[in-house]
């Protein structure tokens, strides 16, 4: 069980709501500026409304500050909502 616990802390997920697809690039750039890597993105565009949301799975080798990353993502133009998923 100990290995499973260690593995689960090696990545985290962030839910993001945003206005348009062009916001994805600055999201990735911001995550990477923390020395982290986006492993996976689950993207939704509910009913083609232009209200996009994504769940980013982020590799977190040194257990960095999730909250700090989330705060920076909130500052990106076009981002409406950011939520950490534990």
How would you describe each model-predicted region?
Residues 15, 57-60:
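Short N-terminal micro-motifs specific to bacterial/archaeal maturation
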């Amino acid at each position: 069980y100990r290995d499973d616990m260690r593995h689960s802390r090696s990545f985290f997920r962030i839910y993001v709501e945003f206005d348009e697809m062009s916001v994805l690039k600055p999201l990735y750039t911001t995550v990477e500026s923390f020395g982290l890597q986006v492993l996976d993105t689950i993207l939704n565009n509910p009913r083609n409304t232009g209200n996009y949301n994504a769940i980013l799975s982020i590799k977190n080798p040194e257990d960095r500050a999730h909250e700090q990353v989330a705060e920076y993502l909130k500052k990106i133009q076009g981002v409406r909502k950011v939520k950490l998923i534990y």
